Amino acid sequence: MPVESGAGNDQPKRLTVLSGPSGVGKSTVVKELRRRRPEVWLSVSVTTRPPRPGETDGVEYYFVDDAEFDRLVAENELLEWAEFAGNRYGTPREPVLKRLAAGQPVLLEIDLNGARQVRANMPDAFLVFLAPPSWEELVRRLTGRGTESPEVIQRRLETARIELAAEKEFDVTLVNTSVHEVCDELLALIAAPSTQ
């Protein structure tokens, strides 16, 4: 499994941030990781997006209105937040801090800008970049979903170019050639003791 070092490997790894371009397999890797190691706590994001059929408040997301989201931002209750497709998403700060204080490993699955905000708010966070094996494979994965219009796919690919260019801002890069192998590597990083 290819692992490449980036900004520095001496950060504590209890708060792990997983990021990478759309279509790289973040959700699939996280689902496998949680299946194997349910004690790794995955933060539940807050969103202004309406629930989709089958979604439960507090499970997939915490669903809030714009006024509540504005309050969370104003009172600095989010580690990071961003707007996507007209909806806002954010990571509640308090549950993350509670889990970390209890010594529980915490995983955040967020985008590049969210990862940057977490690094600014919590410099000890360990940032992991999930990269595709190749640009061609990323294009294949995004177009193969069959769930989005060509315009949306094009926007995602443009964003992916920006995200791939920011790879060196991360502490380590994992190349997603195999979900099981990359999950093994991610679990090893999460379990690695802090060097501080």
UniProtKB/Swiss-Prot annotation:
Coiled coil: none annotated. Keywords: ATP-binding, Cytoplasm, Kinase, Nucleotide-binding, Transferase. It comes from the Bacteria. ATP binds at residues 20-27. Its main location: cytoplasm. Its EC number is 2.7.4.8. It is found in: Cytoplasm. InterPro entries: GK/Ca_channel_bsu, Guanylate_kin-like_dom, Guanylate_kinase, Guanylate_kinase_CS, P-loop_NTPase. Residues 13-191 form the Guanylate kinase-like domain. One of its GO terms (molecular function) is guanylate kinase activity. It catalyses: GMP + ATP = GDP + ADP. Pfam families: Guanylate_kin. Belongs to the guanylate kinase family. PANTHER family: GUANYLATE KINASE, GUANYLATE KINASE-RELATED. Essential for recycling GMP and indirectly, cGMP. This is Guanylate kinase. It comes from Thermobifida fusca (strain YX). The lineage of its organism: Bacteria, Bacillati, Actinomycetota, Actinomycetes, Streptosporangiales.
